[in-house]
Design a protein with these regions (language model features):
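Structured catalytic cores of large enzymes
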Residues: 1-233
Length: 233
């Protein structure tokens, strides 16, 4: 039925993201953060109204709930945090000082700030609303990171803080990058049903070494409690 004088339309608009930027990189895999555009955050939306009816893109759908349906106890929730603290310049050549190309290079884009060996990065995910009876290996962790100095190092990832369970420790020397996706982790790693801390550590013998993190994400079984959030998935 047409909208009455008391009805309203709730409209959600999102800023432009960085997905179209992928084609600008010399290798599209170099892009570590596609949430934010390097060109513009502007997006345009148009709402049109046809008072005569017969709209092209809107049709009335029947929303009939099935009888005797059993509600799902949980769903697999993904939470991804994309950082925009600094604009990392990516790969560099040392010619007396670091010199950067005009090309879109590995690691170039928005990231968290530089992470040095003495200061691990810690990201707390809260509230989880964990469904503890979910799949036994239903926990996943994702990290996109890159080196930011001409040194050797390992990228180390821990669950439950820097001294918690180590789930990844692999070399990422110089300006190389890693897109880490660790699946089928034990759900028992989530010892706290309300929050979890994912820690990223720069393991290097050079105290001034640097790495950057573009994004951190997790997937886990969650109850249908969204804490009054307006946007979730």
């Amino acid at each position: 039925a047409p909208l009455s004088s008391s009805d309203y339309i709730e409209f959600l608009g999102e800023m432009n993201d960085g997905k179209p930027d992928k084609a600008l990189y010399r290798d599209q895999d170099f892009q570590l953060n596609d949430r934010y555009s390097l060109e513009t955050d502007t997006a345009a939306y148009f709402l049109t109204v046809n008072t005569a009816g017969g709209n092209l893109r809107y049709t009335t759908a029947v929303n009939t709930a099935p009888s005797a349906a059993t509600p799902d106890a949980y769903f697999m929730r993904s939470i991804d945090i994309h950082y925009k603290k600094i604009l990392n310049r990516g790969y560099a050549n040392r010619v007396g000082e670091y010199v950067y190309s005009s090309a879109y290079d590995p690691g170039e884009g928005f990231t968290f700030g530089d992470i040095i060996p003495s200061s691990p990065m810690q990201e707390r995910f809260v509230p989880l609303n964990l469904y503890t009876a979910g799949p036994a290996n239903g926990f996943s962790v994702r990290v996109n990171a890159a080196g930011n100095a001409e040194n050797t190092r390992n990228l180390k990832i821990n669950v439950n803080g820097p001294t918690g369970t180590e789930i990844y420790n692999v070399g990422m020397p110089f300006f190389t990058y890693r897109k880490v996706a660790i699946n089928n982790l034990p759900l028992a790693l989530l010892t706290n049903t309300t929050n979890v801390v994912i820690a990223v550590t720069n393991v290097s013998g050079v105290s001034t070494d640097r790495l950057v993190v573009a994004s951190i994400g997790i997937t886990y079984p969650s109850t249908f409690n969204f804490n009054n959030e307006k946007k979730f998935y």
